[in-house]
Amino acid sequence: MEVLLATFTTLFSIVNPFGAMPVFLTLTAEDRAAERARTALRACVYMVAILSVAFFGGQYILNFFGINIQHLRIAGGILLMRSAFELLTPGANRDRVGPDALEESKHKDDISFTPLAMPMLSGPGSMAICIGLIRPTYVDKAMTVFGFALVALAAFIILLFSLRLTRVLGKPGMAAMARIMGFITLAIGVNFFATAIAALFPGLTR
């Protein structure tokens, strides 16, 4: 249960489905509610698949390139802290999808895989976190994947009601949510960085 909770709390703030809402609404503006729901569902299923591939195949990727797991955690921590500062800084560019990519996506028949699933919901930060997760037992591995599914379920619900949430929260509410998610992501990034440094240089913690 602890593994499930840790996976959910860590990933949810990094995935940050609230940040995906504006792009989702822009790209599905002309769709009916049923089609919008199908797009959100497909994107969340793709997200679980992407994170699962990163989780199960990550160690093989690290071994192939000769990368130490702690080095990956340091890189992931820096990446998360950078993303967090973008969310916390007023007026900073918070778009995960550039204007050119956004314009191109408007003409695509299916936007669920890209740009929604990747990079909006499962970007480099979330994939780095999944690769860095070490689960020694099959039960822990299963709980981790279940955690991915719970994050996807939460993201699906948020995207499904994104139009109503945007109307209720308004711009001030959305900005507040971005700062809350940014603060949590910053704390997670610092924790990843500090834990990796402590593992590489145990003498520093004495």
Task: Enumerate the predicted regions with their spans.
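Small-residue-enriched transmembrane helix starts and helix-helix packing motifs
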Residues: 1-14, 90-91, 97-117
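Juxtamembrane helix-boundary/capping and inter-helix hinge elements in multi-pass membrane proteins
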Residues: 26-37, 105-108, 134-140, 171-174
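Transmembrane-helix boundary and interhelical-loop signature of multi-pass inner-membrane proteins
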Residues: 32-33, 53-76, 155-200
